[in-house]
């Protein structure tokens, strides 16, 4: 008889094969739930709603350091992005370069979220803009946020204002009360209020005019492709059934292989149609998204270093503190 486990993740091409059953975990019956990550992380950190769940890497490090031992991390990495390249600014703000963010009012959905961690890290290490140089305005409330579930307090020397419940990052960007925003989503959920499409608004633009070019520049210089979300499992399940960890990892490897095959087929069709250059064929076949500790150690350790630097954790979190011991050599 298979072991039934509830699992929750956000829908994307690399997780959907788990949801639709094309990628199965041996010996496990997965009861899959697709949940927006902002709500998912709050519910898991607050209520432990699922046996296995996608999880913010930043929030997991914070929870573990604070003594929350309910979960253990799995090095299954579902989303990545060059987050700093997508900072939004008002066109009339006079913000033309990252250095211009100093002294400005900047909105963030949640200060401790991994996307904001990476954005602040890039601003500081690439452009000399410290979190202490910015006045932050946070949308999520203490009762409905990852930080509310982990006891978040603004780091020393950093100004983090709470946005009133009748406002949001989106509304304050349009009113001019905010001049810039980090990792803006514009999708209302159980914990998010912003709903305005700022990316297509005539008064708003990205700080970096060519977001793809900035991502390429950053990657070529640093070798970092920032990880946003991983997975976690209830510690009691992992300890009672240690085989589950590797079977879950194999299932997500299968899901990733399906996604890669579909991506390559789509790219091939676009090349044949003249929508992509021939040079894209080799680039798109390179496997840049991998699971496991070994392939991602530099990225994970950089995130841990940023967490310490930014005052989210008070000690440098070792990967051994966060992830299952049996995965450390994978």
Kindly give the residue locations of the regions a language model identified:
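Beta-rich nucleic-acid/ligand-interaction surfaces
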Residues: 143-147, 153, 324-329
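Basic/polar N-terminal segments that are highly enriched at the extreme N-terminus
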Residues: 1-5, 153, 330
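Conserved C-terminal helix/tail region of periplasmic/extracytoplasmic solute-binding proteins
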Residues: 312-330
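Pocket-lining segment of extracytoplasmic ligand-binding domains
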Residues: 147-263
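Secondary-structure end/capping motifs
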Residues: 232, 237-309
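Short, glycine-/small- and polar/acidic-enriched structural segments
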Residues: 6, 13-145, 151
């Amino acid at each position: 008889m298979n072991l039934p486990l509830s699992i929750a993740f956000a829908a994307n091409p690399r997780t959907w094969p788990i949801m639709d059953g094309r990628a199965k975990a041996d010996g496990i019956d997965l009861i899959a739930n697709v949940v927006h990550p902002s709500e998912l992380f709050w519910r898991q950190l607050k209520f432990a709603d699922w046996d296995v769940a996608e999880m913010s890497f930043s929030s997991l490090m914070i929870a573990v350091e604070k003594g929350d031992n309910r979960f253990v991390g799995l090095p299954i990495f579902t989303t990545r992005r060059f987050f700093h390249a997508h900072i939004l600014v008002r066109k009339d703000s006079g913000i033309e370069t990252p250095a211009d963010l100093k002294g400005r009012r900047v909105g963030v959905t949640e200060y401790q979220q991994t996307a904001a961690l990476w954005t602040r890290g890039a601003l500081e290490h690439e452009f000399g803009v410290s979190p202490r140089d910015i006045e932050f305005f946070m949308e999520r409330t203490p009762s409905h946020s990852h930080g509310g579930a982990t006891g978040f307090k603004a780091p020393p020397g950093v100004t983090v204002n709470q946005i009133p419940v009748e406002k949001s990052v989106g509304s304050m960007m349009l009113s001019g009360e905010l001049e810039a925003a980090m990792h803006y989503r514009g999708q209302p959920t159980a914990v998010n209020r912003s709903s305005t499409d700022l990316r297509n608004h005539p008064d708003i633009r990205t700080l970096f005019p060519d977001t793809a070019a900035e991502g390429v520049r950053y990657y070529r210089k640093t070798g970092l492709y920032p990880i946003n979300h991983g997975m976690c499992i209830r510690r009691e399940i992992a300890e009672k059934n240690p085989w589950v960890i590797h079977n879950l990892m194999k299932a997500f490897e299968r899901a990733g292989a399906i996604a890669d095959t579909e991506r390559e087929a789509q790219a091939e069709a676009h090349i044949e149609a003249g929508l992509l250059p021939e040079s894209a064929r080799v680039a798109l076949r390179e496997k840049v998204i991998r699971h496991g500790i070994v392939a991602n150690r530099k990225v994970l350790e950089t995130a841990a270093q940023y967490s310490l630097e930014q005052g989210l954790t008070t000690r440098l979190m070792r990967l051994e503190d966060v992830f299952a011991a049996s995965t450390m050599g994978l």
